[in-house]
Design a protein with these regions (language model features):
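Flexible coil/turn and secondary-structure edge motifs
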Residues: 2-5, 16-238
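Sec-dependent N-terminal signal peptides
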Residues: 10-13
Length: 238
């Protein structure tokens, strides 16, 4: 993995920030304005929350985007695509586990549709035309992938990718893989809510804060200032 190791750099971030910014000044991905999906789910008359697992590079930024999205009740950073036994940060970083850094997005379909979730995913959460890398991070664990849980999710995602490619919305073809969800394994606690807890960490400032800003700018109706966080969800009730 190409991100600076957390064990030492959180303490050294202030000292390294000047040189780090100079090296990664162009790392942030630009947002792309894209049309809404023609094929989408209809809000069910009843039922509960739904979930989709998305991979789009470093999970810090993807998680932050959905934590600020109205209708999302939880966004958890984790790993998908490999075995439970190898779902650990250090092992995933070897690029031999099959895992992708992913975010499990739980949402209320009465407030936001899967199609809108995917519109945000393709436009501000990551660049879907980059094969096995995102910004400064490279390797299969940073691949663009939608881990679909059922046929409806697969159908909507397939149709949307075809729609965007046919419209030539991006300068290059979309490389997002559709993979059947076989398991999602939450990442270590120190990865959860990383942007919320470390908003001035250099990697976050350069690569991920712009994503949240683009969400607010391009999806004002879906944006919320106060994020829904994992730590808040796990906080014991009084």
């Amino acid at each position: 993995m190409t991100r600076i190791q957390l064990t030492s750099t959180l303490a050294l971030a202030a000292l390294l920030s000047v040189s780090w910014f100079a090296f990664n000044a162009c790392a942030a991905e630009p947002a792309v304005v894209i049309p809404a999906p023609v094929v989408d789910q209809t809000a069910p008359a009843g039922g509960g929350l739904q979930n989709v697992v998305l991979a789009g590079g470093c999970f810090w930024g993807v998680q932050a985007v959905y934590e600020h999205t109205k209708g999302v009740t939880q966004a958890v950073s984790g790993y998908s695509g490999g075995a439970k036994e190898t779902a650990h940060y250090e092992l995933v970083g070897t690029e031999r586990t099959g895992h992708a850094e992913s975010v499990s997005v739980t949402f209320d379909p009465q407030q936001i549709s899967l199609g809108k979730i995917l519109q945000i995913y393709f436009s501000v959460a990551h660049n879907p035309t980059e094969l096995n890398y995102q910004g400064p991070d490279s390797g299969p664990s940073y691949r663009s992938a939608i881990f679909y849980a059922n046929d409806e999710q697969k159908r909507i995602a397939e149709a949307y990718i075809a729609q965007l490619d046919q419209a030539h919305v991006f300068k290059a073809p979309i490389v997002t893989k559709l993979e059947a969800l076989k398991g999602f394994y939450p990442a270590e606690d120190y990865h959860q809510d990383f942007l919320v807890l470390h908003p001035t960490y250099p990697y976050i400032v350069v690569n991920d804060q712009p994503k949240v800003g683009n969400l607010k700018r391009l999806f004002a109706d879906q944006y919320r200032d106060t994020p829904v966080t994992v730590m808040a969800a796990n906080k014991p009730s009084q």
